[in-house]
Amino acid sequence: MTHMPARPVDGAEPLSALPAGPMRQAGTQRSGIYEISKVLTAPARLEITLANVVNVLSSFLQIRCGAIVVLDAEGQPEIAATGDIPPSSQSAARGVIPKAVIDHIATTGMPLIVKDVSKSELFQAEPQPPWSSGTVPISFIGVPVKADNKILGTISIDRVRNDAAPFPADEDVRFLTMVANLVSRTIRLHRFLNLEGRRPIGEQERPEKPIIAQRGAPGRHPPVKIDGIIGDSPALQQVVETVSVVARTNSTVLLRGESGTGKEFFAQAIHELSPRKNKPFVKLNCAALPEGVLESELFGHEKGAFTGAIAQRAGRFELANGGTLLLDEIGEISPAFQAKLLRVLQEGELERVGGTKTLAVDVRLICATNKNLEMAVANAEFRADLYYRISVVPIVLPPLRERPGDIPRLANALLDRFNKENQRELTFSSSAIEVMSQCYFPGNVRELENCVRRTATLARSSSIVSSDFACKNSQCLSSLLWKTDGSPGGITVDGHARSNVMPTSSPRSGGSIGASDEVSSVKACDPHGSGCPAMESRLTQRDRLIEAMEKAGWVQAKAARILGLTPRQVGYALRQHRIEVKKL
């Protein structure tokens, strides 16, 4: 494959020469990256995943069309995914983006910006170009998809150029480069599975099958059982399936979820299912130690390195050599320590505190946080380069309110543990199970365990009934978390704590994503109210779809953002459920 030389292109301008007017609010970009990361971690074939990424791009960028082209080992187009046509392979890939354009981006390894494709020789090499729009000027932006300095493909967008508005190339390139970084990790993961002779993720799934149906279809894969993980809800099983696939590799995993969702259990599961299972599993809570002590704990120290260092000590990285290291609350480390950690992750080498000898370590890293790292990066509180190092495979753990069907099994398992510890033989009555199933549990499994232990301790008979629960006697202090801002005499959740909650799995407001700079977080509410997410999760797929359409004013694109889907999937779901779109 002949590449064009890396030289200025007719009709294209270098990035620095273009005006740097703001393209959109930072909140929109954060929401876009979050939605794309969810698409990339969903179980599906690579072609379908990339097509869904393009659909998400079209929801967050004002574009005419977009495309992702994946190159094979010889540099030839292998997959071409767009939002308008089904994913294509080699023959159709050449018609999506001109071959000369792909060659130019692959050769230079740099973004390509063309303000008017009709004036660029790269776009005139093929007859009847599909990107041509007559006399309307079309601008083009493309970036390479790279991993370890190897070009895996390209991501590109084009839009109708508006001479009255500034050309927002800088913001577009930055956003597309972040997307390309995430896409490159997914491509490498799929290729690794193919080399290992394993069935690609989602190989037998239909491209047209919407995510609503996927989530509601337990049994599309044989269920995976992990010790310590209790539940068979679709939301939990999807995470378990992802964990079982990711565990076979050495990729860094970022576990995200609210407090009490079981991040440490899943980290342990990844280690036990990995080839490193016979090596050490070491864990450390980064928020529990000050920066100076944290450095010594992770990297170790030499004798006499500081007051009290009476002997040489190995750090957690050395102790986990050959195995797995879990860094919990990774979002709480200081910027200065982030730079030190980044070097270890990049080079695989470290020096003990007070030492000069460089030590090589082989560690599989798992990080966990309930903090919104995208917002922290935007606010310069968390290094972007470290974010990309630790967020290779992000896995979002569902809160308990999104899997209420698992509450009875969890409650019985927790009660069995209590019985063994206290030599009791307590059981739950059906009314007791009903009470717990209707609770909101802002503290997730940790709060459920608190509720079970308190109720079991105070139970007056061997069978726990509904009247034994504190909430039935107006003594449940956790219910104060359900009071919203402005409630008379109510206690509200601290604003700083809310800012540390990661984005919800799907936006529940009627507005479009990114309409505000603030990333919405789950607000505690009355579990018996109709607006509570715990009750919403029990609605049927058809009810959720109609509710989202009504909130969006029957605009499919807005409803897609509310549901966390693409407009195409919403349209398919409307046809599948025979829902007539209202004209307002």
UniProtKB/Swiss-Prot annotation:
Record-linked Pfam families: GAF, HTH_8, Sigma54_activat
Q: Name one GO molecular function term.
A: ATP hydrolysis activity
InterPro entries associated with the record: AAA+_ATPase (IPR003593), GAF (IPR003018), GAF-like_dom_sf (IPR029016), HTH_Fis (IPR002197), Nif-specific_regulatory_prot (IPR010113), P-loop_NTPase (IPR027417), Sigma_54_int (IPR002078), Sigma_54_int_dom_ATP-bd_1 (IPR025662)
Native organism is Rhizobium etli (strain ATCC 51251 / DSM 11541 / JCM 21823 / NBRC 15573 / CFN 42)
Please report the stretch or stretches of sequence annotated as the GAF domain.
Answer: 45-187
SUPFAM superfamilies to which the protein is assigned, alphabetical: GAF domain-like, P-loop containing nucleoside triphosphate hydrolases
- Binding, a divalent metal cation: C471, C476
| Presence of the UniProt keyword Transcription regulation in the record | yes
The identity of this protein, by name, is Nif-specific regulatory protein
Segments of this protein annotated with the region Inter-domain linker = 458-541
Q: Where is this region: Disordered?
A: 1-24, 495-518
Which part of the chain engages DNA, per the record?
A: 556-575
Described purpose of this protein according to its UniProt entry: Required for activation of most nif operons, which are directly involved in nitrogen fixation.
